[in-house]
Regions:
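N-terminal subdomain of nucleotide-sugar transferases
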Residues: 1-47, 75, 102, 152-154, ...
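Conserved acidic donor-binding segment of nucleotide-sugar-dependent glycosyltransferases
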Residues: 315-325, 334-340
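Glycosyltransferase donor-sugar binding loop
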Residues: 36-39, 203, 228-241, 256
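Nucleotide-sugar-dependent
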Residues: 13, 210, 259-266, 271-296, ...
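Conserved donor-binding/catalytic core segment of Leloir-type glycosyltransferases
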Residues: 4-6, 194-210, 216-220, 229-230
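A short, well-ordered alpha-helix in the C-terminal region of glycosyltransferases
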Residues: 190, 334, 341-356, 362
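Nucleotide-activated donor-binding/catalytic signature segment of Leloir-type glycosyltransferases, i.e.
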Residues: 240-264
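Carbohydrate-associated surface elements
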Residues: 159, 172
């Protein structure tokens, strides 16, 4: 049986969730990821993933119609999984379903409209009138009214479950690969030029809703000379945050995007993983995938009480108020002053991840849904 996973844009981090589902199913089924690529390339961290990826050109309307036709013609699967409530994934999947009667599983891991709604009035108006963009607001807004046409729906947090219903499947991780016992923290620190340093890590692309500004403000308040902020997977936009720092600029180390399979190596260098999410429409309907990376690697995690984060951590992390850089700085200091407590929280977080959020969990749930769809045909 062949499973085709549609990704709305292969060139950005939306490929992360699509890749996760593909890896969960690859041991049981023939799996392929397909979709358009806005930049023409594959998102770097998953460029070498051991799953076939078929990429198509991204164009503006009306020229994108030819891409849609090509994708629909090329799909030769028994089951479609559409990642994200987007027209270039779910929309295309529905057209293929109506043409060929192929069952569609809709995977929703973000509230897509939340990313559009955080702007002001005129920003919303401008985005809503952007009809030439295949992934634009008008078509994304329309997709919410078509969720009932999916044969099955899975969601990544309770906000989305309350809004769209469906089965709740959190981001999961392969805890056998993300295993701290397989990595040497000191040697990785030495490799990064951080020998004898205490490291606070931020994973992923810096964005305002991720609390990047609060993290830099917190670093300004920390006077301990051996503490460093290591940003892994950052792009060029991070430089403006560094330039705006009043002090401690020399304590910030930036690593560009890394391949997904190297993530455990870099994460092993962290003493603390910081995920200071803000409370915005961007974050209310999502749960950060890096939360599960940190849990799997038994890292002490500082984060905020947004979305399902407290439930996922189960008390095995450090929760602060969103937007509070003072509290973030104090919590960093507290963790370094209480290493044994932090170590135990990290270990318990890993145990929780192994029990509830291992890749086998998502494999079992997806396989169950696929069997139901194929036996009812």
């Amino acid at each position: 049986m062949k499973i085709c996973i549609l990704c709305f844009d292969l060139s950005n981090n939306s490929l992360g969730r699509a890749g996760l589902l593909a890896m969960a199913l690859a041991s049981r089924y023939e799996v392929e990821i397909i979709g358009p690529s806005k930049s023409g390339d594959i998102w770097f961290p998953m460029k070498d993933i051991d799953i076939p990826i078929r990429s198509y050109p991204w164009k503006r309307y009306p020229f994108f119609v030819s891409t849609i036709r090509k994708i629909i013609k090329d799909i030769d699967a028994d089951i479609l999984i559409a990642c994200k409530l987007r027209p270039t994934s779910f929309g295309i999947a529905l057209i293929k379903k109506w043409v060929s009667n192929i069952p569609v599983i809709l995977d929703i891991d973000d509230w897509e409209l939340g990313f559009f709604y955080h702007t002001g009035f005129w920003g919303k108006v401008g985005r809503f009138l952007n009809f030439s963009n295949p992934g634009g607001l008008p078509y994304t807004w329309l997709m919410e009214y078509f969720t009932g046409y999916a044969d099955s729906t899975i969601v990544s947090n309770r906000f989305l479950k309350n809004k769209f219903s469906g089965s709740l499947i959190y981001h999961c991780r392969d805890t056998s690969k993300l295993n701290p016992e397989n990595f040497d923290t000191d040697s990785m620190k030495a490799k990064l030029g951080l020998k004898d340093k205490r490291v606070v890590m931020f994973l992923g692309t810096p964005r305002p809703h991720k609390g990047t500004e609060e993290l830099f403000r917190a670093m300004e308040k920390i006077r301990e000379p051996d503490i460093r902020l290591l940003l892994v997977g950052a792009d060029s936009s991070i430089q403006r945050y560094i330039d705006n720092m009043k002090n401690n600029q020399d304590k910030v180390i930036v690593i560009p995007q890394i391949p997904f399979n190297e993530l455990p190596n870099y994460l092993s260098a962290a003493d603390i993983l910081a995920i200071p999410q803000r409370d915005t429409t961007d974050t209310q309907g999502q749960i950060p995938a890096k939360l599960f990376d940190g849990m799997a690697m038994a890292k002490p995690i500082i984060t905020t009480s947004i979305s399902d984060i407290p439930e996922v951590l189960g008390g095995h992390g450090y929760l602060i108020e969103p937007g509070n850089s003072e509290q973030l700085a104090n919590t960093i200091k507290f963790i370094f002053a209480n290493p044994e407590e932090a170590r135990l929280k990290g270990q318990n977080a890993r145990k929780r991840c192994q029990e509830l959020y291992d890749l086998k969990v998502i494999e079992k749930e997806l396989t169950s849904q696929i069997k139901k769809l194929t036996t009812t045909q």
